[in-house]
Amino acid sequence: MAFDGADSWAHPELFQFDEECLPKAVAGCPPDAFSATGQLWGNPLYDWGYHKKDHYSWWIKRMEYSLKLYDVVRVDHFRGFEAYYSIPYGDPTAEFGHWEKGPGLDLFARLKKSLKKEELPIIAEDLGFLTPEVHEMLKESGFPGMKVLEFAFDDSENSDYLPHKYQENCIVYTGTHDNETLVGWYENMNRRNKSFAREYMGCRHTPKKEMHWEFIRLAMASPAKLAVIPVQDYLGLGAEARINEPSTLGKNWKWRLLPGEITGDVLKQCRRMAKLYGRLPETVSDINM
């Protein structure tokens, strides 16, 4: 929730604010592979003690309305429900924060009960710094986590993001809004990782301009229950089509899909792969294209 958002203004009791409605601390994440100084998001932190006392009524209303709009809700920063990173308000970077305990699965148990659902249609965004406690919370929740294919080829050749290590109860993405497009990412890979990726996929002789389709194929062929492919990757677009670069300002969230960019040939290839790997809905599987 943004500091200047409607809920922050209307319901300051939901957040860790002082008497003047200024944040006592703000959200972010510690230094990692994305940023040497961490990510300073600046969002106010929830007052979980208040939310629990109020039986999570704000969360129930929020989820209830979201499920009127969407079939599935991706819960961002799922690890924050186990423990969240608290950064002193006014700090210029996220380097000097600390971890505090979140509500755990108590929130989701209350959501299930209040919304009268045996299973909540939730995808848990479980990326970033994960502890054994976070892994255990995800397992106990039953929610599918996320696998990002671009994380699989990272010099180790033993990454947990390699598709042969996936369980069915996960969602595979070629990349998210925080990643480079497949084309931009492959362009910046070192020779060793490119060689390993080609060997892993059995495509040593695939032309460079077709490599994005090999990674899409890898995601489609994985055991993951759902494969999510950004449209930029289907179109084979480069760094100019990246959505967001963490810890930067000015150029993010500006890319737009223009009319006519998705051609008939691209649609045919999308359908062919989806059908080949059993990911085409039955209602359209026999439609000629």
Show which residues each predicted segment covers.
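In a subset of proteins, long, contiguous C-terminal domains/tails are tracked
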Residues: 236-289
